[in-house]
Amino acid sequence: MGLDKLFPNNILFNEYHLNHLDENMEMQVSGISGSCMMIKAIIFNDIGNFDEQFYLYQEDSDFCLRVIKSGWRVYYVPDAQIIHAGGEGGTKANIQRAIFEWHLSYFKFYRKHYAQDYLLPFNILFYMLMAIKLVLTYFTIPFRK
């Protein structure tokens, strides 16, 4: 169980899932899930496509951050409806691979957008903590539903 489940309304642990926000209000946000994006074509012309270095996971976070850095805005729109065929992104089929890919993509995302802002010792600490988180997450697999 992650901290997002223990503290569902805490912005620190739930910013990606937007659980801390009123789901009935349209609002500007720092990012949204790639499974429910509507994007103007002009934005692709401005910033490019999704970054293919992200095989699985974090491609949406990377895209939203690049959108914001280039002066565009990202909105959560509660009335928008999208049919997401399939879902789960393969997480049920191979949970070990999904966990590994999530952590690898998060590492790439951090390295691309944030590592240059910190000194090497902090980055090493961050990478070590991510590795520990990966190992601990693997230990939780038998307890998942």
PLM regions and their residue ranges:
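Active-site-adjacent helix/loop segment of glycosyltransferases
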Residues: 65-144
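A generic structural signal for ordered alpha-helices
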Residues: 17, 21-22, 32, 45, ...
